Amino acid sequence: MRAKAARAAARPKPGTKPVSDAAVLTKAVVRAAQLLSFSQRELARILGVSEATASRLCAGSYQLSAARMKEWELALLLVRLFRSLDALWGHEEAAHTWLASHNVALAARPLDLVPSIEGLVRVVNYLDNARGRL
């Protein structure tokens, strides 16, 4: 019964336009970057796009696209990072403190690792493992 109700709730209401995956991911990335206090320059490095593109993304005049696979996948990882931090700590200040603190298991500050693809994947995997223990 719950699955049926969930499917019904997920359907667009009559007279409304369905929201694209690109619009949802774009909004989630911008919101995550804001809540994690990432500058547009940092967001550009994380997504592998130019600073101008990151600026347009934050202004709402650029949308992520699954056709641009690299930025799409990095955006998904950034949202996973945010969701994991939120699940583990529940508020921004604790997440900021964790990101800025040296982590022995990662051998660095997570904030320093996130701008590289390898570092972002390592941090997300670390957080996924931490969430799995909850």
Task: Go through the PLM ranges and name each one.
Residues 1-134:
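Non-transmembrane "mature" sequence context
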